[in-house]
Amino acid sequence: ISKPTIIPVEPNKPVVSKTIESQPKHFIKRTVAIGRFTNETNYGKGFFDKSSEQGIGRQAMDILSARLAASEKFIMLEREDMDLINSELEMNNLGNLNIAADYLILGSISEFGRKTTGEVGVFSRTKKQTAFAKVNIRLVDVATGQVIYSEEGSGEAFSEAGTVLGAGSQAGYDSSLNDKVISVAISSLVNSIIENLTEKPWRSYILSIEDEVIIIAGGKTQGINVGDSFNI
């Protein structure tokens, strides 16, 4: 009998619009920040809390931030550890970091749980552990405070082990299922988040006007090239 294996149950992936599939290589990145990602369930209260580095809310935030950054379509701004960043800036006699995001992501884990089932035969016994989660996210336009998109994603993962005539693996509590199911639930939303953010028109702010020269926020790191023109 083989050792227990974790099997993520992948949800149906959101359909990516033709607009996203046909986007040109020249793409201006949006500036995005994840404002919060909280655990609103009763699971793990007192241990999986915001102050814990192992909290599932913090874990969900890290996974989502990593997935969006990997898409190379956004400039991700750190918000959760802003105090640490500002402390480092102060040590170098630099001012606090004040960069506003174009869009803010607010999220929560609305459902999280586990169950264990088993089957006992004449010569065999199996044990199956299943974890499931649901996450909710909202996209907020920082300039207007308007919620422009919201969606719920879900995920499931399980591990199974068995014995035959007393031989085989004994399955204890599999804590790694918690990590896997959160990752699956977040993954079910990533395509839709990217699609909705990239469909919004890029905008910037006028920093200064000198004679007939207008200086705006943005640059090469966002994908702006020499010769690009914009509507005001």
How should these model regions be labeled?
Residues 177-200:
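Short, structured interface segments
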Residues 230-232:
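Beta-strand/loop-dominated core regions that host nucleotide or nucleotide-derived cofactor-binding catalytic loops
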Residues 163-166, 171-174, 178, 189:
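Active-site-adjacent mobile loop/cap segments within catalytic or ligand-binding domains
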Residues 150, 159, 164-165, 187, ...:
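Acidic, serine/threonine- and glycine-rich low-complexity intrinsically disordered segments
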Residues 102-163:
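Amphipathic beta-strand/beta-sheet edge segments enriched in Tyr/Trp
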Residues 26, 52-60, 96-97, 101, ...:
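Extracytoplasmic/periplasmic, Sec-exported soluble proteins
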Residues 52-57, 62, 69-122, 128, ...:
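Short, solvent-exposed, polar/charged sequence segments at loop or secondary-structure edges
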Residues 1-75, 81-85, 143, 151-156, ...:
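A structural "domain/chain start" motif
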